[in-house]
């Protein structure tokens, strides 16, 4: 994505992102499982693309590789309920993503490329598929008011109440 206003895209782990095909990833997974017996994998991409995760899920299912896995995403609209079901079938147990703030005004200023409603729909799709959702949240973004923060807390409370997210972590805004 590399567009969020607070993200330092010059950092090596962001600017030098190197993709691997689903086939290569599953080759590596099979090798690790064979060598270590490890069957739990955390993919630590900053925001794994939906197409890449779909390809990974399809390859895991095609090869009948049984693992548990989780990763980090942006709450993109292409994470449909159908894709969430496919990911769950392939062993996905959790997703983490940056909701950041529950304010469309602030999300726009942040250039997150998502809306509050979109986040609610995507997280609900994951949760309905049995995938746990963790939301990263922040406070103190420039121009964020006390009322923005209060509204965000209430919205996050509703996301928990409606089963859209199962965990969340608030941190103070700081530029990277």
Regions found by a protein language model. Give the residues of each.
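Catalytic cores of alpha/beta
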Residues: 82-84, 143-158
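Acidic/polar loop patches that form or flank catalytic/metal-binding clefts of enzymes
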Residues: 39, 68, 134, 163-170
């Amino acid at each position: 994505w590399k567009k969020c206003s607070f993200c330092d895209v010059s950092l090596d782990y962001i600017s030098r992102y190197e993709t691997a095909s689903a086939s290569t990833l599953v080759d590596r997974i099979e090798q690790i499982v064979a060598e270590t017996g490890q069957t739990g994998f955390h993919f630590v991409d900053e925001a794994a693309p939906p197409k890449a995760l779909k390809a990974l899920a399809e390859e895991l299912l095609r090869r009948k590789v049984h693992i548990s896995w989780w990763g980090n995403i942006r709450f993109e609209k292409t994470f449909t309920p159908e894709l969430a079901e496919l990911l769950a079938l392939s062993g996905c147990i959790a997703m983490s993503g940056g909701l950041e703030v529950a304010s469309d005004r602030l999300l726009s200023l942040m250039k997150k490329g998502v809306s509050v409603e979109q986040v609610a729909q995507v997280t609900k799709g994951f949760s309905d598929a049995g995938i746990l959702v963790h939301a990263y949240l922040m406070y103190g973004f420039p121009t964020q008011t006390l009322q923005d923060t209060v509204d965000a807390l209430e919205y996050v409370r509703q996301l928990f109440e409606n089963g859209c997210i199962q965990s969340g972590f608030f941190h103070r805004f700081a530029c990277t």
